């Protein structure tokens, strides 16, 4: 009979194994694993928050600070869903959404508008340019993931 070794007395864990334990890879059963999500917002805080939440769920995250930067990245990265702030410099969220929805390649890509405003006019304007949903900032993890579940068939 082999003695049971107390893990505390065993050799130290391999550094690579420690890294994997600290940063687990999402399982294949994870509905968000490998999903490509784009977050367009001029607020570094919003971009980082969304990126952190989404990466923990297994998503691949692409970020942009405004619509101009986003358009090139959308063409290159082909995201599964796009979150876009309505108020940004150079090319705002409404204009960005309209350009995405008028493009034959990306018109079926879900676009979720992000705003600190919760007015009926802002929501209606988002719908007019083709957005699929409207989230008010600050959003919760559940709201962010719920939007993905609703619009992307995982």
Name each model feature, range by range.
Residues 77-83:
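Active-site beta3 strand of CheY-like receiver
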Residues 58-65, 73:
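Short hydrophobic/Thr-rich beta-strand motif most characteristic of the beta2 strand and flanking loop
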Residues 48-56, 124:
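Charged docking surfaces used in two-component/phosphorelay signaling
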Residues 139-148:
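C-terminal output helix
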Residues 1-26:
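C-terminal catalytic ATP-binding subdomain
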Residues 88:
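Receiver (REC) domain active-site loop signature in two-component systems and cognate sites
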């Amino acid at each position: 009979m082999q003695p049971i070794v107390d893990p505390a007395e065993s050799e130290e864990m391999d550094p690579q194994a420690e890294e994997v334990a600290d940063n687990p890879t999402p399982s294949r059963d994870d509905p968000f694993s490998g999903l490509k999500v784009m977050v367009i917002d001029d607020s570094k805080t919003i971009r980082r928050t969304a990126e952190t939440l989404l990466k923990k769920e297994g998503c691949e995250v692409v970020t942009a600070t405004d619509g101009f930067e986003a358009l090139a990245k959308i063409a290159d990265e082909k995201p599964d869903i796009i979150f876009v702030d309505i108020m940004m410099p150079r090319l705002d969220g409404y204009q960005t959404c309209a350009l995405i929805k008028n493009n034959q390649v990306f018109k079926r890509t879900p676009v979720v508008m992000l705003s600190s405003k919760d007015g009926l006019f802002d929501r209606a304007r988002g719908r007019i340019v083709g957005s699929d949903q409207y989230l008010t900032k600050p959003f919760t993890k559940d709201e962010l993931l719920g939007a993905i579940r609703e619009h992307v068939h995982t």
